[in-house]
């Protein structure tokens, strides 16, 4: 069995040491069961990442992922439209560190590709899906969507249907792009509602009448 109390002690020790080692750079530290989350301003992200990678006490030599969260319609929108989470792994400490920051809509943040080669593709994915621009990136172009794609499909305000219909025309033997044509007006469904609520309501209203 895992010794979670000991793991938490390690995380607290690392967090407090970081706060004292680079004063003024760390905005907030949160201690989770399986990882340590450190929140910083986006302008200080690269400095803190470099320290976590190179300092002998941390040795966060692996960037496993960069996660982007669209904060539209949730409380964190007050801090920034997007939350970026850099998932680091320290084999030396047998722990994961999440370094997080916030970026505005169509915001700019400096690339981390100079520190971690794995971030080259990860940052391209975030640029393609969310529209966050990574300054000084060696090859920032779309990686998942089609050529000439308009918009950023994982933003919450991007229409589910998209803007264009793309298909291969067998007769013309070419790919066709045309505007989306809906046979009925688009509807927003309440996925939180229990199935049959509306029918039960109508049934009860008819009984009352």
From Swiss-Prot:
The keyword Mitochondrion applies. It catalyses: a ubiquinone + NADH + 5 H(+)(in) = a ubiquinol + NAD(+) + 4 H(+)(out). It is an enzyme of class 7 (translocase). It comes from the Eukaryota. GO terms for molecular function: NADH dehydrogenase (ubiquinone) activity. Belongs to the complex I 30 kDa subunit family. PANTHER family: NADH DEHYDROGENASE [UBIQUINONE] IRON-SULFUR PROTEIN 3, MITOCHONDRIAL (PTHR10884:SF14), NADH DEHYDROGENASE UBIQUINONE IRON-SULFUR PROTEIN 3 (PTHR10884). It is found in: Mitochondrion inner membrane. Keywords: Electron transport, Membrane, Mitochondrion, Mitochondrion inner membrane, NAD, Oxidoreductase, Respiratory chain, Translocase, Transport, Ubiquinone. Complex I is composed of about 45 different subunits. Core subunit of the mitochondrial membrane respiratory chain NADH dehydrogenase (Complex I) that is believed to belong to the minimal assembly required for catalysis. Complex I functions in the transfer of electrons from NADH to the respiratory chain. The immediate electron acceptor for the enzyme is believed to be ubiquinone. Disulfide bonds: none annotated. SUPFAM superfamilies: Nqo5-like (SSF143243). It comes from Dictyostelium discoideum. GO terms for cellular component: mitochondrial inner membrane; respiratory chain complex I. Its EC number is 7.1.1.2. This is NADH-ubiquinone oxidoreductase subunit 9. Its main location: mitochondrion.
């Amino acid at each position: 069995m895992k010794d979670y109390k000991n793991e938490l002690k390690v995380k607290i020790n690392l967090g407090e040491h970081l706060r004292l080692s680079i004063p003024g750079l760390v905005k907030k530290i949160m201690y989770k069961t399986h990882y340590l989350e450190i929140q910083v301003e986006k302008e200080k992200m690269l400095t803190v990442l470099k320290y976590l990678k190179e300092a002998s006490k941390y040795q966060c030599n692996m960037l496993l992922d960069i996660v982007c969260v669209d904060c539209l319609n949730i409380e964190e929108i007050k801090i920034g439209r997007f939350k970026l989470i850099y998932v680091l792994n320290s084999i030396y400490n047998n722990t994961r560190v999440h370094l997080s920051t916030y970026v505005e809509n169509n915001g700019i943040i400096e690339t981390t590709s100079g520190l971690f080669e794995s971030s080259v593709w990860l940052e391209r994915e975030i640029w393609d899906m969310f529209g966050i621009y990574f300054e000084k990136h060696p090859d920032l172009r779309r990686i998942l969507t089609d050529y000439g794609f308009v918009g950023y499909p994982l933003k919450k305000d991007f229409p589910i249907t998209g803007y264009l219909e793309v298909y291969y025309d067998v007769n013309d033997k070419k790919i066709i792009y045309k505007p989306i044509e809906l046979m009925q007006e688009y509807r927003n469904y309440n996925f939180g509602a229990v199935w049959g609520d509306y029918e039960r309501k109508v049934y009860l209203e008819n009984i009352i009448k």
